[in-house]
């Protein structure tokens, strides 16, 4: 039994535990159904209707085992309040001692020892979220080069006159994220650091108090 909190990634493309040196992944069918139907009340699992909150409970329970304290649940920063509430409510059926953070919070731990300002770039299926002194979203409606150029302009505006570290989140579970994040236009995002989970997410968690 680990004395630390389990750190659980809830989305964008998987539900899994990131701490303790190895991935523990929720059942693929259950997690896929839970993520796909997070905006609904009922989902189909093996062609049968299942309550979405039940799917989230099962998925979170399977990856939170063997940890004494309540979990730290990390969700995509661009999720709506309603989506976050679905995950939070499911986690609280496991234990009332639950801590919920956006993904940008976890990624910022990677630069916790740096004095410069931090900007987090999260690449999602349909948008790129830029979180710094403010939060902005760039739609992924055009090619990767154009999107990278637009994101670079947003970063330049946010960091005008200051030194900043740019953390680029490139989830392996998001289609096209690696190509978008690896675009030549990203070279203009100065002081950039790519976070390709889960290994580098674990590095970030080492500075997270109370996690494995």
Task: Indicate where each model-derived feature is located.
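A generic structural signal for short coil/turn motifs at secondary-structure boundaries
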Residues: 76-79, 174
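Short beta-strand/turn micro-motifs composed of small residues
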Residues: 74-77, 168-169
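Conserved phosphate-binding loops in N-terminal lobes of ATP-dependent enzymes
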Residues: 1-75, 82-91, 136-160
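Helix N-cap / beta->alpha transition motif
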Residues: 28, 51, 102, 193-196
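C-terminal single-pass membrane-anchor helix
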Residues: 206-212
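Short, charged, surface-exposed secondary-structure boundary motifs
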Residues: 110-111, 202-204
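Small-residue (GG/TT-enriched) beta-loop-alpha framework at ligand/catalytic clefts
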Residues: 84-176, 184-193
